[in-house]
């Protein structure tokens, strides 16, 4: 369950395992260095991230982040890692207790993961390009290689992202997905619907990733899915606000060490 606090939501099921998995609200401020907002002073985003870490009692953590470019690239942060700022990386995994993994959003879908057997965590940025490129599949493969992760041991959180009612897409968008995954597949049939008033397709990125997770071996009882919608004014939304939108963070870290 996603529990709302003043400045963020946290996932209760992750908290029960000693994992902070949070999604920041708009009133926590813009979190992304690569998305400067008009009139915002330099360094504001870093201050906002530090303030969030302080609020979560995680101020000692080393922040890890990337200039995200809608890839399916997932980076391992291990004991030999000395670089913490990346480019062209859209997800991280780690078993280190001294880092906080940051990813950034304004409608795209965060995928939070915790390997309950091997004590490893991750967070992956899955907008429609990440979903199309199957970042979830790649992330699980990276975890298997790094930690011996098995899907049945994964606790996974999906959200917070934009809901289908506000996610209108073009015919080419639909055709590209249908060609890759199969027009009659469960993935496509359950993830797209036509708005009867406009005749336009609407995409359900959350359902797409839920079905993908099940196909990849995640147990349904280990899936935690948010019903919140980033179209709501309490979140940043690129579709609602356009280029002036800031970015939320989806951050994951171990609680104590």
Describe every region a protein language model picked out.
Residues 1-257:
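Active-site microenvironment for binding and transforming phosphate-containing groups
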């Amino acid at each position: 369950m996603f529990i709302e606090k003043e400045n963020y939501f946290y996932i209760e099921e992750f908290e029960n395992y000693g994992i902070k998995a949070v999604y920041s609200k708009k009133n926590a401020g813009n979190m992304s260095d690569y998305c400067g907002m008009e009139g915002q002073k330099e360094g504001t985003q870093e201050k906002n991230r530090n303030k969030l870490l302080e609020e979560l009692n995680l101020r000692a953590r080393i922040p890890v982040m990337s200039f995200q470019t809608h890839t399916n690239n997932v980076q391992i942060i291990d004991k030999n890692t000395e670089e913490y700022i990346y480019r062209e990386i859209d997800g991280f995994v780690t078993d280190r207790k001294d880092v906080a993994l940051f990813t950034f959003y304004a409608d795209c879908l965060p995928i939070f993961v915790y390997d309950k057997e091997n004590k490893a965590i991750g967070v992956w940025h899955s907008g429609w390009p990440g979903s199309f490129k199957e970042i979830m599949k790649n992330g699980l493969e990276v975890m298997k290689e790094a930690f011996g992760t098995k899907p049945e041991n994964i606790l996974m959180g999906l959200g917070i992202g934009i809901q289908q009612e506000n996610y209108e897409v073009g015919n080419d968008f639909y055709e590209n997905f249908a060609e890759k995954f199969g027009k009659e597949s469960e993935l496509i049939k359950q993830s797209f619907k036509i708005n009867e008033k406009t005749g336009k397709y609407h995409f359900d990125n959350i359902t797409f990733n839920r079905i993908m997770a099940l196909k990849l071996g995640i147990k349904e009882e280990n899936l935690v899915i948010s019903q919140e919608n980033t179209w709501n004014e309490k979140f940043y939304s690129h579709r609602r606000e356009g280029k002036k939108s800031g970015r939320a963070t989806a951050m994951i870290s171990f609680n104590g060490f």
